[in-house]
């Protein structure tokens, strides 16, 4: 009996030793929490690597349509690249997360949702952490066109965005921040809405007509130019610039060449004279054009304006002060914009005009039904199909003393200035044409006077001010948590 017991004990010990040597049945099974943590660690290994501390990176991709023609607007097709257009990316990291700021030499970000999705998938960066800001350049591929040539361009464009994002992230370098401001001189930009001696309000490019003389501008032009410079040791500094003026004047209305308008010379000059990397972010330019024949100082055109702005940027950098970095704070807020109501009769008239193919007949019907332009006809039809409200996504990103507030529309200059004045941050960039394209967003004052931008706006009076207030609310909350 004892012999049998000893044999059983020996066999049990042998089995235990075998189990230990093979690693079987000796480890405590993972708890669900431990399993989840392990999966999380595995996933984090696939995410974009983030360096410690505050750092910035820069990259740029040429997105010009080389070798093929491309539609620029309803009447023009470009077949030559006079000056390259670019997708520029500035990456900002606080050591824990990354934000990407894109400056795009295109008219608008109509396909902002696609841009966000594509680059987020390529980099792992959340969509909320990105600004895609158009410079509002009118001399590039038409982002709203559905033609095959523009589709061809978009395919290359999306690849360029992903590459620029990855390269900017790879370029992340420890950085210090400096902020500066300077005013552009008289004549560099002006409010394109004004009152004539007969009391009527006018705008766009009607300055030199035979109509009654201009007696007053609707508001003063916002001339402030803002810079954020990232000093990066042995690597080139990055200078981000925020100013406001339509990039819509290169060559002529029947332009057939690609260029970035005044931003071409602006970029070239800053990078040559300051030996930095440059990124331009369009401000509240909905009612602001550059240059004006009514000012004492006259500029020859878009190329000279770009060169003049180089000196303004240099002055802003000369005026700069050190700024803190701090943690990235990122908020996306979506406002419900109340859509303007259209009468059934007005919609019927617009559709009748839209069905007409002959320009002469269109003009006759527009005159008959008191439509100011074909743009108003399109806006009436679109508003009728939009429902009661439409979402307006507002993105705000801040770090230390610096804040960025975006708008997916053409914000008016007075609203942009109001936003910056109300922001608690020492430096605020207000970026229009960002992450979407909702057309013009006139100020409440402009609604009172009427005109082209009001005729084509999709939303009710006061929506622009609502967006300003919401952005200020977010930035105030961010500032309190710095």
Regions found by a protein language model. Give the residues of each.
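Sec-dependent signal peptide cleavage junction
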Residues: 15-34
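Conserved beta-alpha junction segments in alpha/beta enzyme cores
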Residues: 45-134, 141-278, 283-285, 289-304, ...
């Amino acid at each position: 009996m004892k012999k049998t017991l000893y044999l059983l004990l020996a066999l049990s010990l042998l089995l235990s030793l075998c189990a230990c040597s093979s690693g079987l049945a000796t480890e405590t099974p993972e708890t669900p929490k431990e399993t989840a943590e392990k999966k999380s660690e595995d996933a984090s290994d696939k995410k974009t690597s983030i360096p410690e501390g505050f750092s910035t990176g820069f990259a740029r991709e040429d997105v010009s349509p080389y070798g093929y023609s491309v539609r620029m607007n309803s009447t023009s097709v470009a077949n030559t690249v006079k000056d390259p257009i670019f997708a520029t990316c500035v990456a900002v990291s606080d050591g824990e997360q990354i934000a990407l700021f894109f400056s795009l030499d295109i008219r608008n970000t109509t396909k902002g949702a696609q841009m966000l999705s594509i680059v987020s998938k390529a980099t792992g960066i959340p969509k909320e952490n990105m600004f895609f800001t158009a410079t509002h350049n009118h001399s590039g591929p038409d982002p709203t066109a559905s033609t095959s040539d523009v589709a061809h361009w978009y395919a290359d464009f999306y690849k360029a965005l992903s590459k620029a994002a990855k390269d900017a992230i790879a370029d992340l370098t420890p950085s210090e921040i400096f902020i500066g401001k300077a005013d552009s001189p008289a004549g560099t930009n002006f409010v394109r809405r004004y009152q004539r001696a007969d009391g009527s309000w006018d705008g766009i490019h009607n300055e030199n007509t035979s109509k009654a003389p201009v007696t007053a501008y609707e508001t003063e032009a916002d001339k402030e130019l803002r810079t954020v410079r990232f000093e990066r040791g042995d690597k080139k500094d990055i200078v981000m610039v925020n100013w406001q003026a339509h990039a819509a004047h290169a060559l002529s209305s029947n332009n057939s060449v690609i260029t970035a308008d005044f931003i071409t010379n602006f970029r070239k000059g800053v990078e040559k004279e300051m030996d930095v990397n440059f990124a331009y972010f369009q401000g509240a330019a909905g009612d602001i054009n550059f240059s004006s024949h009514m000012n004492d100082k006259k500029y020859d055109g878009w190329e000279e304006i770009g060169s003049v702005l180089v000196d303004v940027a240099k002055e802003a950098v000369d005026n700069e002060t050190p700024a803190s970095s701090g943690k990235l704070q990122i908020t996306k807020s979506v406002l419900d914009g109340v859509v303007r109501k259209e009468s059934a009769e007005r919609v019927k008239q617009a559709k009748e005009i839209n069905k007409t193919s002959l320009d002469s007949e269109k003009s006759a019907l527009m005159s008959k039904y008191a439509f100011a332009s074909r743009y108003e006809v399109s806006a009436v039809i679109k508003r009728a199909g939009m429902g009661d409200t439409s979402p307006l996504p507002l993105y705000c990103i801040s770090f230390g003393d610096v804040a960025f507030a975006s708008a997916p529309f053409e914000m008016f200059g007075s609203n942009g200035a109001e936003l910056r004045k109300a922001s608690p941050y020492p430096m605020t960039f207000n970026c229009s044409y960002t992450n979407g394209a909702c057309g013009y967003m006139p100020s409440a004052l402009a609604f009172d006077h009427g005109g082209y931008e009001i005729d084509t706006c999709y939303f009710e009076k006061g929506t622009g001010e609502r967006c300003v207030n919401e952005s200020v609310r977010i930035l105030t909350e961010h500032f309190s948590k710095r």
